């Protein structure tokens, strides 16, 4: 703990602390080593018990800089974290481009007849993934889902 999204001075990041050592590094890197040295927060169990206080302190510190700063600083010390991207940021990501992970799917409602989707990151040499079903429109399957899950029909 913590394993969640945090606001920064500009865009959000996700932090995924997996052990007490990573928590100490997180606190040191954000300039708040006293959080980790508090006996109530020294262990994961203690942090879970005092979640609201821990999260409030971390949020306040992380709001002092932007996401690029924190992702670089925390990554440099081994604290798992990453940016929370918008869809346009996902499609512009250098790794997404390098791995050719953008798939243009035909879509009747799209302005140019196609909508970009993110490809499966797992690649099989003998059984490549096939993309056959276009993404649904908002509420396109709502009636079927309500009927299947709740037995209701509008």
Task: Locate each region found by the language model.
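Generic alpha-helical structural context detector
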Residues: 24-28, 88, 126, 147
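Aromatic-enriched alpha-helical interface/lid elements that frame and gate functional surfaces
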Residues: 1-77, 81
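Flexible, small-/acidic-enriched active-site or ligand-binding loops
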Residues: 42, 107-154
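A glycine-rich dinucleotide-binding beta-alpha-beta segment and adjacent secondary-structure elements
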Residues: 76-129
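A generic structural signal for secondary-structure junctions
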Residues: 28-31, 95, 101, 151
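Residue-level detector of short coil/turn "hinge" positions at structural boundaries
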Residues: 34, 81, 103, 153-154
